[in-house]
């Protein structure tokens, strides 16, 4: 007589219970991953950006590239030049501060597997800090195809 974790009674096969276990496993693996329109949490931000180079575009159409090194340093490039600084995650906000230009902290939302949308924090009427409605920039890990819903465009 066979028994096991997926059998409801000795010798019986239970598809329903197997499906329940499979669904539970999938849900456990997806815990902590922001869905579209939801801000990412600190651990997800750090895991997504540490040691990665993002290529991206600001909402004004300017392209940039930024490398987030494991030691917390950052290297930034755009059409106007390059800069260095530091990156960190503070209270679920992604922060970048530079030697030669102003830095800031941002809410980050994920769009698909490889598109990160950055929003400036603003104070809501009730006093909470929330993402601004209009995105500041979008970026993607250059090692994979971007999954942003509208592909970036260059203005020529």
Kindly give the residue locations of the regions a language model identified.
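Bacterial N-terminal signal peptides
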Residues: 18-30
